[in-house]
Amino acid sequence: TNGQASCLLAYGQSRKWGVWNAYNRVPIFIKCGDTTASWAPQGSLGVSNNSTNNKITPTVGLPEEFLDCTFTQEVALSIAATSAIQLGIGFDSTTVASGRTTIVGAALSGGQTITVAAWTGTARYVAQPSIGIHNIYPLDKLTNSGTVAGGEDDMLLLVTYRG
Protein backbone atom coordinates (compact mmCIF):
# COMPACT_ATOMS: atom_id res chain seq x y z
CA THR A 1 0.00 0.00 0.00
CA ASN A 2 1.30 3.47 -0.86
CA GLY A 3 2.64 5.45 2.09
CA GLN A 4 3.53 2.41 4.21
CA ALA A 5 7.03 1.19 5.00
CA SER A 6 7.90 -2.34 6.11
CA CYS A 7 10.70 -3.21 8.50
CA LEU A 8 10.88 -7.01 8.55
CA LEU A 9 14.06 -8.26 10.22
CA ALA A 10 13.01 -11.61 11.72
CA TYR A 11 13.76 -14.85 9.84
CA GLY A 12 11.36 -15.63 7.00
CA GLN A 13 10.70 -14.88 3.34
CA SER A 14 10.51 -11.48 1.59
CA ARG A 15 12.40 -9.62 4.31
CA LYS A 16 13.01 -5.89 3.93
CA TRP A 17 14.00 -2.73 5.70
CA GLY A 18 12.03 0.09 4.10
CA VAL A 19 13.38 3.22 5.85
CA TRP A 20 16.65 5.14 5.80
CA ASN A 21 18.15 7.46 8.43
CA ALA A 22 20.81 9.65 6.84
CA TYR A 23 21.78 11.42 10.08
CA ASN A 24 22.01 8.58 12.59
CA ARG A 25 22.95 5.40 10.74
CA VAL A 26 23.09 2.22 12.80
CA PRO A 27 23.96 -1.38 11.86
CA ILE A 28 21.04 -3.25 10.26
CA PHE A 29 20.98 -7.05 10.08
CA ILE A 30 18.31 -8.59 7.82
CA LYS A 31 17.97 -12.38 7.69
CA CYS A 32 15.98 -14.47 5.26
CA GLY A 33 15.35 -18.11 4.47
CA ASP A 34 12.89 -20.82 3.56
CA THR A 35 11.23 -22.87 6.30
CA THR A 36 10.55 -25.86 4.01
CA ALA A 37 12.22 -28.92 5.59
CA SER A 38 14.24 -29.85 2.47
CA TRP A 39 14.20 -29.70 -1.33
CA ALA A 40 16.26 -30.72 -4.33
CA PRO A 41 17.70 -27.68 -6.12
CA GLN A 42 17.07 -27.27 -9.84
CA GLY A 43 19.65 -28.18 -12.51
CA SER A 44 20.60 -24.58 -13.27
CA LEU A 45 21.46 -21.72 -10.93
CA GLY A 46 18.23 -20.25 -9.55
CA VAL A 47 16.51 -18.98 -6.41
CA SER A 48 16.51 -21.46 -3.52
CA ASN A 49 13.47 -23.75 -3.50
CA ASN A 50 12.48 -22.10 -6.81
CA SER A 51 10.71 -19.34 -4.83
CA THR A 52 11.32 -15.65 -5.54
CA ASN A 53 9.89 -14.99 -2.06
CA ASN A 54 13.33 -16.02 -0.78
CA LYS A 55 14.84 -12.54 -0.91
CA ILE A 56 16.00 -9.54 1.08
CA THR A 57 15.16 -6.02 -0.08
CA PRO A 58 17.25 -3.36 1.71
CA THR A 59 16.73 0.37 1.21
CA VAL A 60 19.83 2.54 0.79
CA GLY A 61 19.33 6.32 0.89
CA LEU A 62 22.88 7.48 0.14
CA PRO A 63 25.49 5.79 -2.07
CA GLU A 64 27.95 5.46 0.84
CA GLU A 65 27.13 2.06 2.35
CA PHE A 66 28.42 -1.38 1.37
CA LEU A 67 25.91 -4.24 1.53
CA ASP A 68 27.62 -7.30 3.05
CA CYS A 69 25.69 -10.39 1.85
CA THR A 70 26.31 -13.93 3.14
CA PHE A 71 24.42 -17.11 2.23
CA THR A 72 25.00 -20.26 4.32
CA GLN A 73 23.27 -23.55 3.47
CA GLU A 74 23.41 -27.12 4.77
CA VAL A 75 23.76 -29.64 1.94
CA ALA A 76 23.12 -33.41 1.94
CA LEU A 77 24.28 -35.52 -1.01
CA SER A 78 23.40 -39.13 -1.80
CA ILE A 79 26.30 -39.99 -4.03
CA ALA A 80 26.87 -42.82 -6.48
CA ALA A 81 28.73 -40.59 -8.94
CA THR A 82 30.00 -37.05 -8.97
CA SER A 83 27.40 -34.88 -7.20
CA ALA A 84 27.60 -31.24 -6.22
CA ILE A 85 25.51 -28.28 -5.16
CA GLN A 86 26.57 -24.74 -6.06
CA LEU A 87 25.54 -21.87 -3.79
CA GLY A 88 25.57 -18.19 -4.70
CA ILE A 89 24.03 -14.78 -4.10
CA GLY A 90 21.89 -13.10 -6.74
CA PHE A 91 22.23 -9.33 -6.52
CA ASP A 92 19.20 -8.02 -8.45
CA SER A 93 19.21 -11.33 -10.34
CA THR A 94 17.47 -14.69 -9.89
CA THR A 95 19.88 -16.61 -12.18
CA VAL A 96 23.33 -14.96 -12.03
CA ALA A 97 25.56 -15.15 -8.95
CA SER A 98 27.60 -12.17 -7.77
CA GLY A 99 30.73 -12.39 -5.65
CA ARG A 100 32.14 -15.63 -4.29
CA THR A 101 30.13 -18.78 -4.99
CA THR A 102 30.86 -22.13 -3.42
CA ILE A 103 30.51 -25.68 -4.69
CA VAL A 104 29.87 -28.44 -2.17
CA GLY A 105 30.21 -32.03 -3.33
CA ALA A 106 32.25 -35.11 -4.03
CA ALA A 107 33.70 -36.88 -7.05
CA LEU A 108 33.55 -40.67 -6.97
CA SER A 109 34.68 -43.29 -9.46
CA GLY A 110 34.96 -47.05 -9.76
CA GLY A 111 31.59 -47.91 -8.20
CA GLN A 112 32.20 -46.07 -4.92
CA THR A 113 29.13 -44.75 -3.09
CA ILE A 114 28.36 -42.50 -0.16
CA THR A 115 24.93 -43.01 1.39
CA VAL A 116 24.57 -39.47 2.75
CA ALA A 117 27.23 -36.81 3.07
CA ALA A 118 26.42 -33.50 4.78
CA TRP A 119 28.32 -30.24 4.40
CA THR A 120 27.73 -26.57 5.04
CA GLY A 121 28.60 -24.15 2.24
CA THR A 122 28.87 -20.36 2.30
CA ALA A 123 28.69 -17.80 -0.50
CA ARG A 124 29.54 -14.11 -0.01
CA TYR A 125 29.14 -10.85 -1.91
CA VAL A 126 29.97 -7.32 -0.81
CA ALA A 127 28.01 -4.88 -2.97
CA GLN A 128 29.58 -1.54 -3.80
CA PRO A 129 27.75 1.57 -2.55
CA SER A 130 24.68 2.49 -4.57
CA ILE A 131 21.40 4.26 -3.94
CA GLY A 132 17.90 2.76 -3.97
CA ILE A 133 16.48 -0.67 -3.25
CA HIS A 134 17.95 -4.00 -4.31
CA ASN A 135 16.63 -7.56 -4.33
CA ILE A 136 19.14 -10.07 -2.96
CA TYR A 137 18.41 -13.77 -3.53
CA PRO A 138 19.94 -17.05 -2.26
CA LEU A 139 20.82 -19.18 -5.30
CA ASP A 140 21.46 -22.91 -5.63
CA LYS A 141 22.13 -25.48 -8.36
CA LEU A 142 22.23 -29.29 -8.18
CA THR A 143 24.39 -31.66 -10.24
CA ASN A 144 23.12 -35.27 -9.94
CA SER A 145 21.39 -36.12 -6.63
CA GLY A 146 21.14 -34.27 -3.34
CA THR A 147 19.02 -32.02 -1.15
CA VAL A 148 19.37 -28.87 0.90
CA ALA A 149 17.69 -28.13 4.22
CA GLY A 150 15.50 -25.19 5.21
CA GLY A 151 14.92 -23.39 8.47
CA GLU A 152 17.10 -20.80 10.19
CA ASP A 153 19.47 -23.46 11.58
CA ASP A 154 20.23 -24.82 8.08
CA MET A 155 19.65 -21.96 5.61
CA LEU A 156 20.46 -18.30 6.20
CA LEU A 157 20.79 -15.35 3.84
CA LEU A 158 22.12 -12.41 5.86
CA VAL A 159 22.57 -8.81 4.68
CA THR A 160 24.27 -6.25 6.92
CA TYR A 161 24.78 -2.53 6.34
CA ARG A 162 24.35 0.84 8.07
CA GLY A 163 21.12 2.71 7.50
Show the residue positions of the predicted features:
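Short, conserved, surface-exposed binding loops centered on an aromatic residue
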Residues: 57-63, 78-79
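C-terminal interaction-tip segments
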Residues: 5-7, 11-35, 39, 59, ...
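Terminal beta-strand-rich extracellular "head" domains
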Residues: 66-131, 139-163
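Short beta-strands within extracellular/lumenal beta-sheet-rich domains
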Residues: 43-60, 117-123
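Aromatic sugar-binding interfaces of carbohydrate-active proteins
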Residues: 1
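Intrinsically disordered, low-complexity, compositionally biased regions/tails
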Residues: 7, 16, 22, 37, ...
